[in-house]
Amino acid sequence: MANTTGRIPLWLIGTVVGTPVISLVGIFSYGSYSGLGSSL
């Protein structure tokens, strides 16, 4: 595997991008489960 991302490792990009996405999905899922998103 060639490092084509320059000085930024791919796992770091995945962590930075993935963490807020997982948090957002978790909050939405919890909201739907607790009844806040039942109107959707």
From Swiss-Prot:
<dbReference type="GO" id="GO:0015979">
    <property type="term" value="P:photosynthesis"/>
</dbReference>
<dbReference type="GO" id="GO:0009535">
    <property type="term" value="C:chloroplast thylakoid membrane"/>
</dbReference>
<dbReference type="GO" id="GO:0009539">
    <property type="term" value="C:photosystem II reaction center"/>
</dbReference>
<keyword id="KW-0150">Chloroplast</keyword>
<comment type="function">
    <text>One of the components of the core complex of photosystem II (PSII). PSII is a light-driven water:plastoquinone oxidoreductase that uses light energy to abstract electrons from H(2)O, generating O(2) and a proton gradient subsequently used for ATP formation. It consists of a core antenna complex that captures photons, and an electron transfer chain that converts photonic excitation into a charge separation.</text>
</comment>
<keyword id="KW-0793">Thylakoid</keyword>
<keyword id="KW-0674">Reaction center</keyword>
<keyword id="KW-0934">Plastid</keyword>
<dbReference type="Pfam" id="PF01788">
    <property type="entry name" value="PsbJ"/>
</dbReference>
<dbReference type="InterPro" id="IPR002682">
    <property type="entry name" value="PSII_PsbJ"/>
</dbReference>
<protein>
    <recommendedName>
        <fullName>Photosystem II reaction center protein J</fullName>
    </recommendedName>
</protein>
<keyword id="KW-0472">Membrane</keyword>
<keyword id="KW-0602">Photosynthesis</keyword>
<feature type="transmembrane region" description="Helical">
    <location>
        <begin position="8"/>
        <end position="28"/>
    </location>
</feature>
<dbReference type="InterPro" id="IPR037267">
    <property type="entry name" value="PSII_PsbJ_sf"/>
</dbReference>
<comment type="subunit">
    <text>PSII is composed of 1 copy each of membrane proteins PsbA, PsbB, PsbC, PsbD, PsbE, PsbF, PsbH, PsbI, PsbJ, PsbK, PsbL, PsbM, PsbT, PsbX, PsbY, PsbZ, Psb30/Ycf12, at least 3 peripheral proteins of the oxygen-evolving complex and a large number of cofactors. It forms dimeric complexes.</text>
</comment>
<keyword id="KW-0604">Photosystem II</keyword>
<comment type="similarity">
    <text>Belongs to the PsbJ family.</text>
</comment>
<keyword id="KW-0812">Transmembrane</keyword>
<keyword id="KW-1133">Transmembrane helix</keyword>
